[in-house]
Amino acid sequence: MAYCNSKTDLSRVPLLALNMGFRKKVGLYLNPRNAVAADWMALAEALGFTFLEIKNYESAINPTVKVLEDWQARSTDATVGKLLSILSEVERNDVLEDLQPMIDEDVRRYCERLNRDPEPPVQVNQVDSCFHRTLERVGLTLHDDPEGTPELFDAFICYCQRDFEFVQEMIRQLEETDFKLKLCVFDRDVLPGSCVWTITSELIEKRCKRMVVVISDEYLDSEACDFQTKFALSLSPGARNKRLIPVKYKSMSKPFPSILRFLTLCDYTRPCTQAWFWKRLAKALSLP
């Protein structure tokens, strides 16, 4: 989409164009249980969520926001146009009428960003072979050649500092064995001095084939991990290319992140499957 105007096809505008302000506002309309008008449960059902999934959303602080977030992550057709169509189907035209100015403004801003940066994220199941060599993206990692091909990796490891001991074990098991995989570990491989968000998005999108997410209670409190996970999911909606692999290595007291529930988990906490854990993970990371 080169530009946007009043005739913009909203079925081609991804849901991520709608900012948090709009999503919270929709929640004010849909979160209250309503015996007459359709609420967030009706929206979730229309979006394709199962009964058990909808029951789990009842514990969310803002279930409407959570439903939209998960729909965006799991569906290939999560667009502004689709959302508006479903709100119309469940007869919540009041929401459409009241929030139309916010929708128009969010779409306008999204299109302006596209005009400034005409290269949207490449949603493919392999590392992008076309590198935009700006100064900000040269010499990011320890073994980068500023004059040659950037350093590439089999997987980006998403983790918080409290889980670094397990990341070190992952390095030993996957890099220093016959698997000979190449992992991108931020604290080890990334050079200091550049914008964290720019480096992270560059590495996940263009340098790494996949991303391993180390899930723990501490992970749930990490803003960096939250950004990395959602960015990786946006590159692979619906997990159609197995780009993101969640790993659980210790028991958790908090609920497993709902945004990752639809992905197959590599679970190190189950004694009966630990013998196969590293082989399964290595195989998943070795796929084309």
From Swiss-Prot:
This protein's UniProt keywords: Cytoplasm, Immunity, Inflammatory response, Innate immunity
What CDD domains has UniProt attached to this entry? Death_MyD88 (cd08312)
Query: One Pfam family this chain carries?
Result: TIR_2
Q: Which InterPro entries match?
A: DEATH-like_dom_sf (IPR011029), Death_dom (IPR000488), MyD88_Death (IPR034249), Myelin_different_resp_MyD88 (IPR017281), TIR_dom (IPR000157), Toll_tir_struct_dom_sf (IPR035897)
Q: Fetch the SUPFAM superfamilies from UniProt.
A: DEATH domain (SSF47986), Toll/Interleukin receptor TIR domain (SSF52200)
Report the residue ranges that make up the Death domain in this protein.
25-103
Q: Where is the TIR domain?
A: 151-285
Could you provide one GO biological process annotation from this protein's UniProt record? defense response to Gram-positive bacterium
Q: Name one GO cellular component term.
A: cytoplasm
Give the GO molecular function terms. TIR domain binding; Toll-like receptor binding
Which purpose does this protein serve, as stated in its record? Adapter protein involved in the Toll-like receptor and IL-1 receptor signaling pathway in the innate immune response.
For region Intermediate domain, the annotated ranges are 104-148
Please give the record's comment on domains: The intermediate domain (ID) is required for the phosphorylation and activation of IRAK.
Q: What is the annotated localization of this protein?
A: Cytoplasm
**This chain belongs to which protein, by name?**
Myeloid differentiation primary response protein MyD88
Q: What is the lineage of its organism?
A: Eukaryota, Metazoa, Chordata, Craniata, Vertebrata
